[in-house]
Amino acid sequence: MEQSNRQTAEPAIRSAETVDSTINSFQETDLKVQEKEDVAAAVQTESASIDSNEQGQSVSANTNTQSQAKKLSNNSHQEPMQMVSAANKERAVLETAQNQKNGNMINLTTDKAVYQAGEAVHLNLTLNNTTSLAQNITATAEVYSLENKLKTLQYTKYLLPNESYTTQKGEFVIPANSLANNRGYLLKVNISDSQNNILEQGNRAIAVEDDWRTFPRYAAIGGSQKDNNSVLTKNLPDYYRELEQMKNMNINSYFFYDVYKSATNPFPNVPKFDQSWNWWSHSQVETDAVKALVNRVHQTGAVAMLYNMILAQNANETAVLPDTEYIYNYETGGYGQNGQVMTYSIDDKPLQYYYNPLSKSWQNYISNAMAQAMKNGGFDGWQGDTIGDNRVLSHNQKDSRDIAHSFMLSDVYAEFLNKMKEKLPQYYLTLNDVNGENISKLANSKQDVIYNELWPFGTSALGNRPQESYGDLKARVDQVRQATGKSLIVGAYMEEPKFDDNRVPLNGAARDVLASATYQTDAVLLTTAAIAAAGGYHMSLAALANPNDGGGVGVLETAYYPTQSLKVSKELNRKNYHYQQFITAYENLLRDKVENDSAEPQTFTANGRQLSQDALGINGDQVWTYAKKGNDFRTIQLLNLMGITSDWKNEDGYENNKTPDEQTNLLVTYPLTGVSMAEADRIAKQVYLTSPDDWLQSSMISLATQIKTNENGDPVLYIQVPRLTLWDMIYINETIKPETPKVPEQPQHPARTLEPAIPQTPEAVSPLPVANKQAVDENKNEIVSALTGEENDLQLPTLSKRSLSISQAELPQTGDNNETRSNLLKVIGAGALLIGAAGLLSLIKGRKKD
């Protein structure tokens, strides 16, 4: 693998002298600061919790007056840049911002989780007039593709003091055909009063994807512990509440777990069935409840996958085929005696027997059974499962001890899947390759997506080691990408409390359960980050109608999904929401034909101490730093493991602290080997950073940079990173950006010059009389405008030395510039009139002289 052997970095890059000199250069440059007034902060401080009683997600943000630093050039080998203050001052600024957070929140939802190309995006939010004046309250939504602002939308409503209004479908819309296919977008929304004071603010991702398989965001739906792991109609309100939140987390595909009657009769067309094979909870499934959930999933634009084993027959049901079609053990082991039918047992009680995947009779039977089941339930595909790998024999060789007559089940999975795809061409299909160790055998199978359930005891893709670290998760994601070109879906279950038969806890997570504790928030987020940064997707979210969800969305803790004994805190639910926004908004940077980069970035503290120790990510107590590359861009992933271990599952629970030491004022070096100095200077102007963590919540900021050379004369990019909580992503845009011509005399915010339909109510000693409310309501001003191509692009925040606040650097703007063209025509037209008038006056004067 590309990253299994790290090369020694150039001595000139790695030397403490070079790093120290660069840090001094960053900190000692005297800046002249050009203040800009009334610029809203793109940096969002820590949000208030999601209100579990409302559907959708609420986001709060702080706004600050910003300052813009002028770009200065240090020398001929350095990039003109905005410099950053000393670490101690910067830390004080960040802490102050944390303390200044307010409780104003946007309740922002969309009508779907994902959109087809050409579909309009309907936004739903509540405008609140929290002021003492009756006035126009305006919602402004800016649509971004990476650093580029594409479009600005506004919706204005005249509201009395303390009055609220929730937009209806069709009132606040991103127009159809505005967004490209297979792209993630960030929607930055703020609500302001008539004086442009920001009242509320929040970010939300939008996904436009005709094909969910490109960027799968997979979640589970399972039975409720309230009713013995059953799926019942009476619990639909709880499921709907979770699905509404998951819609706003942009989930585009769902895995319906254990809603089947039996492995050979998965979903019969009956009102209700018992899962008689399930002796531990005797679960029931009401088919109308399942169909209602499938329908709700479809309404959000997502797909519904029916879970079932690919080879199994439940032990308590009559065989559907003769013994000749079973598979038999070659060796005695966990699946029974050699020469016997392969059997899976729990507590020595048989649960499932297994058929031969090469059996034509079985292939015909199970394909027909699944086709009928998916038709009955309205499902879109089959989430296949296996019990693991085993060396087996066909019936006619079941007594043989010759290994040449045997085969591994994994050797024939691809053939079986391809046969199923031929027989079920209208349905999606995927298989759980447990631990992902058989990708070389499955790479050419006709799976629509690749799904692996990973366990620490599995063998890592890095080699002869268990896959227990964050780096092992990345290695598996990398391996699947290299073999198939697909983004791996990872079932990685968190903490997994374990008890003995007497309910005695066997690990720290189990002791947390007995203490009624929650998941450790950062443990869950770091696993999600490790998988997503590598280009995969962590399937951890689940709708389980479980009281332990705390009004939020469930998190999977073990392979039997209805079991969720740890609680989900409001903090974890809120942060899961923001991580899903990030993964969606930046899907093209994370997993759009993105590969490992051979460049080896390094991370240092402000005093020059190196924090990046191994790019493989198998060691803790470091800033795990590595690079990826895509089409005309590169990324540097920074994952904070400072002060914590690198194990991803965290079975120790709170006994193993997984909250790393937050880092500020970091310096990242990135070698640009083979790049000319002129090209390096250009690239250094296009370096940005974003993070799902509370300090940014997916906003993208420009970064201070310098270019230096190493001892070989190759340029090295030095990047200032203001803060690292858990996960930062540096984005380097390598495209050549054309200069955008400026339109003279264009207002910075043209929409704000619109006059209200009725005068703004002046300040009064007493509130408006109630008797006047109806008359005022009849004349409320409603304005909806779509603005594109504004002269001044959004200014993304960076840190300046003098102001010690977050400023915003102007970024290029793309997209449909109809408004700009319209304004240009107005300017040209006005100019033509002036020229014509001047010519006429000149002609008149000339005639008078004659």
UniProtKB/Swiss-Prot annotation:
Residues 18-28, 44-79 have a biased composition (Polar residues). Its EC number is 3.2.1.11. A motif (LPXTG sorting signal) lies at residues 811-815. GO terms for cellular component: extracellular region. InterPro entries: Glyco_hydro_66 (IPR025092), Glyco_hydro_b (IPR013780), Ig-like_fold (IPR013783), LPXTG_anchor (IPR019931). Residues 29-39 have a biased composition (Basic and acidic residues). It is an enzyme of class 3 (hydrolase). It catalyses: Endohydrolysis of (1->6)-alpha-D-glucosidic linkages in dextran. It comes from the Bacteria. Keywords: Cell wall, Glycosidase, Hydrolase, Peptidoglycan-anchor, Secreted, Signal. It is found in: Secreted, Cell wall. It is a peptidoglycan-anchor. It holds the Pfam family Gram_pos_anchor. The keyword Cytoplasm does not apply. Residues 1-80 are annotated as: Disordered. PROSITE patterns: GRAM_POS_ANCHORING. The keyword Secreted applies. GO terms for molecular function: dextranase activity. Residues 815-850 form a propeptide. The modification Pentaglycyl murein peptidoglycan amidated threonine is found at T814. Belongs to the glycosyl hydrolase 66 family. May play a role in sucrose-independent adherence to the pellicle-coated tooth surface. Homodimer. This is Dextranase. The lineage of its organism: Bacteria, Bacillati, Bacillota, Bacilli, Lactobacillales.
